[in-house]
Amino acid sequence: MLTLLPSLILLLSTLSLSTPANAGAAIAKAYYPGWGSDDFPLSKVTWSKYTHLTYAFAKTTKDGGLTLEGSNPGGLKPFVKAAHENGVKACFSIGGWTGSQYFSTAVSTPEKRTAFVKTIVDFAKKYDADCIDLNWEYPAKQGIGCNTIDKDDTPHFLSFLEELHAATELPISAAVGIVPFNDAAGNPITDVSGFAKVFEHIVIMNYDVWGPWGSTVGPNAPLNDTCAAPANQQGSAVSAVNAWIKAGMPAEKIVLGVPAYGHGFTVKKEDAFQKGSTTKLAKYPPFDNKNRPNGDKWDDKAGKDVCGNDNPAGGIFTFWGMVDNGYLKEDGTPKVPHRFDDCSKTPYVYNPDKQIMISYDDAKSMDHKGHFIKNFGLAGFSLWNAAGDYHDILVDAVRHGAGFKN
């Protein structure tokens, strides 16, 4: 059972207060998907909403190098230029779900670490970047399915980071899971103080907590799960922040990752609604895992992944995709049956004709997350991703909650 820090217990009892105690967050960050630049060019970015924007992704290669292949290689220079013109820090991110295949190899020996450090520093200089983000999914834990992996990835990663930190004055951040990195036995490490010394901040990826790999529909990005039944406590912003702080990461170095997308599930009508109702959605309904729905036009289509394995459709809907597909109105409010879960502080919608239920985030849930960030003294938020929002509804909401002026 999760043991909460006393300060976090106090916070949970005051989450509904409208006047938070902390002065406010400092980092308003988002990822910019290089591969989506045709649909979401730089001219569509509302730069004034952000302090940092991070170009995703530079992928790791077999020989210890980096490549922007698949992420519009010609897009990074104009991205940095536009960010600088708008007074925004321009970062680049290394790795990601499909780009972490060779992270383990690149940091596996002292010689390879030194070479990888030089590669990254040279890359940052070439593109005039202001900051470096590392998105290794995941040290000492398999990600997409064909990543190189070593039981000593975590200590190797720290040694590499210490060398990188010594080689550059640029701030270093990392996107991390909802529990600290794995040790050699596959358990989360209990001391991250060494990492705290080299990271300017970490971004906790508090999304994909529930998805089509489970047996029931659940919240994609729960704010809290300590109020849920034990079987439904899969992780949340509350438990993740607690775990990282308990291991030695200061709250002021933690940025909360928030999503501009949701997971879609095929759910029968008889399972989607509470018994005897045609309007009230059921909690944690079962879904058809053999019939994953197609998401919006940005969703991964069924086919082979980078590992060569057959994959079904992703079932992912961006926030704008939910508007385009008739789940939400232009103002981001629901157009179909809807439920807001008071424990996870996240919404669900269901289209009875398509038999698709989506767990996602809306303005209300983002405002709750923003207040959590502000109340607990976190560094700020990071949106995955800037292109997924619709008319800045989500970023405005989390900014409001976190104490930024919109």
Swiss-Prot record:
This is chitinase-like effector. InterPro entries: Chitinase_II/V-like_cat (IPR011583), Chitinase_insertion_sf (IPR029070), Glyco_hydro18_cat (IPR001223), Glycoside_hydrolase_SF (IPR017853), Glycosyl_Hydrlase_18 (IPR050314). SUPFAM superfamilies: (Trans)glycosidases, Chitinase insertion domain. Chitin binds at Y138, W384. Residues 1-23 form the signal peptide. The gene is Chi. It comes from Moniliophthora roreri (Frosty pod rot fungus). In plants, chitin acts as a microbe-associated molecular pattern (MAMP) that is recognized by lysin motif (LysM)-containing plant cell surface-localized pattern recognition receptors (PRRs) that activate a plethora of downstream immune responses. Residues 26-405 form the GH18 domain. Induction: Expressed during the biotrophic interaction with cacao. GO terms for cellular component: extracellular region.
